[in-house]
Amino acid sequence: MNYFELFKFPPAFDIDTALLAERYRELQRAVHPDKFANDTEQQKLLSVQRTAQVNDGFQTLKDPIRRAEHMLSLRGIELSHETTTVKDTGFLMQQMEWREALEDIRDSADPQASIDELYQSFAEYREQLTQQLTQLLTSEQAEDALLAADQVRKLKFMAKLHDELTRVEDALLD
């Protein structure tokens, strides 16, 4: 299913999330099972299925990584359950530096400053990846779609690392 079509958006990485939320509420009202309470069992079942599609579409389009994965899946590149790793040595080196910095936080003289530095480093790198991804996803070239898939893999790693940093920060606050 093409969630961009469902929500009446052109397939683009940058979307208006406020408009997405508005269209989500409109679709929810239109397909909500309560609206079909007095209809046939088949209509009720269709309503439940449509509601699930609307919910999944909303969750997919509101999350930048899932949105990019969906765009790539529409072009025949499936990333959601893959195990392919990033081969970019520069990124792998940066990843190792971030992991070392994460491990060193607890022993740091100023753990909060170390956490803030890592958040800043993540944000800057993620912004670069997102800009590159936006350009690659607008291209019609098959090679650019494969490069976009690599950017998504990197963003997925960044999201995991960000979650780890948040857990470390939460543990220090406890």
From Swiss-Prot:
Gene3D superfamilies listed in its UniProt record: DnaJ domain, HscB, C-terminal domain
Residue span, J domain: 2-74
Source organism, top-level taxon: Bacteria
Protein keywords: Chaperone
Stored InterPro entries: DnaJ_domain, HscB, HscB_C_sf, HscB_oligo_C, J_dom_sf
GO MF annotation terms: ATPase activator activity; protein-folding chaperone binding
Pfam families tied to this protein: HSCB_C
An annotated GO cellular component: iron-sulfur cluster transfer complex
GO annotation, biological process: [2Fe-2S] cluster assembly; protein complex oligomerization; protein folding
UniProt cross-references to HAMAP family, sorted A to Z: HscB
Subunit structure: Interacts with HscA and stimulates its ATPase activity.
Function: Co-chaperone involved in the maturation of iron-sulfur cluster-containing proteins. Seems to help targeting proteins to be folded toward HscA.
Family, similarity comment: Belongs to the HscB family.
Xref: PANTHER family: IRON-SULFUR CLUSTER CO-CHAPERONE PROTEIN HSCB
Protein name: Co-chaperone protein HscB homolog
Underlying gene: hscB
